[in-house]
Amino acid sequence: MQNLNVGLIGGGFMGKAHSLAYAAMPMFFWPAPALPVRKVIAEANPELAAEAARRFGFENSTSDWRSIIDDPDIHVVDIATPNHLHAEIAIAAAEAGKHIICEKPLARTGEESKAMYDAVKDKNIVHMVAFNYRRTPAVALAKKYIEEGAIGRILSFRGTYLQDWSADPNSPLSWRFQKSIAGSGALGDIATHVIDMARYLVGEFSAVNAVLSTWIPERPLQSGGADALGTVRGGEGPKGPVDVDDEVMTMIRFANGAVGSVEATRNAHGRNNYITFEIHGTEGSIVFNYERRDELQVAFASDQADRRGFRTVYTGPAHPYGEGLWPIPALGIGYGETKIIEAHDFFKAIAEGGSVSPSFADGYQVALIDDAIVESAAKESWVDVPQISA
């Protein structure tokens, strides 16, 4: 079992989640494929970097992310920064021969994502984009049922991701509301998770027809005191423009003939982290709700007439990733476990000299879908989704 030294760039919300995963992964999956060593963490502010190192268990801290790239003892570069920094860091890490895990979205645009993909595709390195919700055991179980043909040929997919943290017009103008940093709003921030799951479960998108809406066109300028999402109340004072979407709705045509839709917003009062999908096929249906993430609802046409309807499967040791989680079904998993599973699969690929999905290729394809959604909304028409070449 080898030790792999990790350099984490970004000490915020996602830095916390990734650090937890590195510490806990060997406790859940033992023997671990490799042992993540929390070597150094980078934050632009030296004091914040030092504090993050103490809090998240890193041996060292730095205010210069380039020192992580230049360090020959670092094996893994973890990018947990705002979106505008992803491409520069990832390309530098690839040129240095580091394995890379990058938070989603891969980048702000398809063009940036292509540059990242081009930087890694011919290198002998493992690269991953952190669409962690597909690591939820119930989602992986849905994939298993689909691959086994349990619901027949897929006809339709309906996915949503609804949050409410930006519904307050007085929440400040954090970077997530600025196109120059984020690239997009709800589209890149949360819809990408559902788009990734749609590709994972159903297949490639061939065309989209979308609407993008910005409900709150300006917000108070941020003056400190906000949390990782920028949510504080009482925004008196000057305001700045919001130039990203608050809500996205898109219809989908899949390459295999199925149809679908994705809706995402961060302005839905009462919806904290509401991720759902329904998949209907010729022989059955699958329903998932992340707020009940230990459960998968299934219905099969083959059931006798007096037993037809949805049944609930509680995930546990008999299901995907069950060997590393909890010994009794429905004991409950959280967001952290999806990150732990993600870390396990990433380090397993490194240890075995393999690859892992979702890779930068997947992140690039999602970015092309996002670009097509933006184009469709501007044109108010269907737009074909380009496919990356292998």
From Swiss-Prot:
**SUPFAM superfamilies per UniProt:** Glyceraldehyde-3-phosphate dehydrogenase-like, C-terminal domain, NAD(P)-binding Rossmann-fold domains
Which keywords appear in this protein's UniProt record, sorted alphabetically? Carbohydrate metabolism, NAD, Nucleotide-binding, Oxidoreductase
Which reaction is catalysed here? Answer: levoglucosan + NAD(+) = 3-dehydrolevoglucosan + NADH + H(+)
The EC code for this enzyme is 1.1.1.425
UniProt temperature dependence: Optimum temperature is 60 degrees Celsius.
- Which parts of the sequence bind levoglucosan? K104, Y133, Q163, R176, D189, H193
Q: Does the keyword NAD apply?
A: yes
Pfam families for the chain: GFO_IDH_MocA (PF01408), GFO_IDH_MocA_C3 (PF22725)
pH dependence statement: Stable in a pH range between 5.0 and 8.5 at 40 degrees Celsius for 30 min.
Q: Where does NADH bind?
A: F13, M14, E43, T81, N83, H86, E103, K104, A130, N132, W175, R176, Y335
Q: Does the keyword Oxidoreductase apply?
A: yes
The GO terms describing molecular function are: nucleotide binding; oxidoreductase activity
Matches recorded under PANTHER family: BCDNA.GH03377
Domain remark text? Contains an N-terminal nucleotide-binding domain and a C-terminal substrate-binding alpha/beta domain.
Family, as annotated: Belongs to the Gfo/Idh/MocA family.
**Subunit structure, briefly?**
Homotetramer.
Q: What does this protein do?
A: Catalyzes the oxidation of levoglucosan (1,6-anhydro-beta-D-glucose, LG) to 3-dehydrolevoglucosan (3-keto-LG). Exhibits high substrate specificity toward levoglucosan and NAD(+) for the oxidative reaction. Exhibits weak activities (about 4% compared with that of LG) toward L-sorbose and 1,5-anhydro-D-glucitol, and activity toward D-xylose is also detectable (1.7%). Can also efficiently catalyzes the NADH-dependent reduction (reverse reaction) of 3-keto-LG.
Q: Write the protein's name.
A: Levoglucosan dehydrogenase
Whose protein is this, by species?
A: Pseudarthrobacter phenanthrenivorans (strain DSM 18606 / JCM 16027 / LMG 23796 / Sphe3)
